[in-house]
Amino acid sequence: MYKRHRKLRNSSAIRNLVKNIYLEKGDLIYPIFIEEGENIKREINSMPGIFRYSIDRIDEELEELKKLGISSILLFGVPLHKDECATEGYNENGVIQNAIRYIKKKYPEFLVIGDVCCCEYTSHGHCGILDEKGNVKNDETLEVLSKIALSYAKAGVDIVAPSDMMDGRVKKISQILSENGFNNIPIMCYSIKYSSSFYGPFREAAGSAPKFGDRKSYQMDFRYSGDALSEVEADLMQGADMVIIKPAMAYLDILYKIKENFGVPVIAYSVSGEYSMIKAAAINGWIDEKSIVMEQMYAFKRAGANAVITYFAKDVARYLDEG
């Protein structure tokens, strides 16, 4: 006698009855690149279908998201001015600060998440302040990050998401938010962020590629898994409310481990390289885009993700409508 597993796979009705992994539009977070300037809608060469928008053109993107039922967005800034100290990152009239104010006034129903990092605002493209040898100075960078987070809070952001990978950033950000009356703003921390080649297209999109060197001294080494739990534990102890796993697809083992050990909300970030590879293969007719994307989304959910940051969010919403 043997177990007949196929009995529960015999028809779509049975498969739908017994499924236990669910995906909803409310699980989707859509990244948006806001470029400083006017009348800008610029497609990103390495990410077909993804654009940079100036604030005066952002309505067309937001209206489409509304119609599709997507209400969570993650903002990245592309400023005109950059310097060694990322001062534009905490400019009260900076591109993201102005975008937050505009969106929250005209589209209050959107959950606006602000990515907190220096790389989009530094002239050298690194995620912090550099010393004379070109190394990122951890504690000096914390001061800048906390200023960026506070400026977002003052502009009306719903969630701050530090992505820099400096030690102690959550504590510093949590302190400055509390001291200024913003203790109710959640911190969605990129607690797990590997030094990955899957980020390539994003760096074109955000104009944030390092001018020299790499980010291996502060982003995590994919050859070592021993620090994953410690990274998350430290961030949670310092005040993080949610954690992001980035990249997601190649690190589902880490995502699962974090969810099992801590039980906190976990966000999977399906990064630009994943998007571009799938798009390129689909454009060439090598894969079925819808099937691949939906399989990927359910994999994130099965591993324990509460939500997914994905450039495919609009497509996924349409697929869900199609059934």
Q: What do the PLM-derived regions correspond to, one by one?
A:
Residues 1-19:
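N-terminal amphipathic/basic leader segments beginning at the initiator methionine
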Residues 11, 20-29, 35-323:
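Alpha/beta enzyme core
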